[in-house]
Amino acid sequence: MEYGSTKMEERLSRSPGGKLALWAFYTWCGYFVWAMARYIWVMSRIPDAPVSGFESDLGSTAGKWLGALVGFLFMALVGALLGSIAWYTRPRPARSRRYE
């Protein structure tokens, strides 16, 4: 077997745990996109609360953006964790003992 060849019979496949991790990551990505679109849709319909000066309220524009940022960061962190698990369980070629 030549290293780097791309014959069909040499194609690597994932283990069942790796497939589960990959599908969990794909599902999370879909949910992430849906949740962000839903958040934008819902928050765009809520009127801003009048706030004067440097005080802030969660109903203000700054509060909406802060809530969106915190939600985005949390969901991105979970997505990064699931993505790293899917990456760790990827199929790898068997190591050859070429230099022994």
UniProtKB/Swiss-Prot annotation:
One of its GO terms (biological process) is FtsZ-dependent cytokinesis. Induction: Constitutively expressed at low levels in mid log phase, in high (10 g/ml NaCl) and low (0 g/ml NaCl) ionic strength medium (at protein level). Residues 38-64 are periplasmic. The keyword Plastid does not apply. Disruption phenotype: No visible phenotype in rich, rich without NaCl or minimal medium. Double dedD-drpB deletion mutants grow 1000-fold less well at 42 degrees Celsius and are filamentous when grown on LB, no effect is seen in low ionic strength medium; few septa are observed. Keywords: Cell cycle, Cell division, Cell inner membrane, Cell membrane, Membrane, Transmembrane, Transmembrane helix. It is found in: Cell inner membrane. The chain crosses the membrane at residues 17-37, 65-85. The keyword Cell division applies. GO terms for cellular component: cell division site; plasma membrane. Disulfide bonds: none annotated. It is a multi-pass membrane protein. Belongs to the DrpB family. NCBIfam families: div_DrpB_YedR (NF038392). A non-essential division protein that localizes to the septal ring in low ionic strength medium. Localizes to the septal ring in about 30% of observed cells before cell constriction occurs; localization occurs in low ionic strength medium (0 NaCl) and requires FtsZ but not FtsEX. Overexpression partially restores correct FtsI localization to the division septum in an ftsEX deletion. Isolated as a multicopy suppressor of an ftsEX deletion mutant; it does not suppress other cell division defects (e.g. ftsA, ftsI, ftsQ or ftsZ). Bacterial adenylate cyclase hybrid (BACTH) studies show interaction of this protein with DamX, FtsI, FtsN, FtsQ, YmgF, DedD, FtsA and MalF, as well as weaker interactions with DedD, MalG and PBP2, but this assay often generates false positive results. This is Cell division protein DrpB. It comes from Escherichia coli (strain K12). The lineage of its organism: Bacteria, Pseudomonadati, Pseudomonadota, Gammaproteobacteria, Enterobacterales. The gene is drpB.
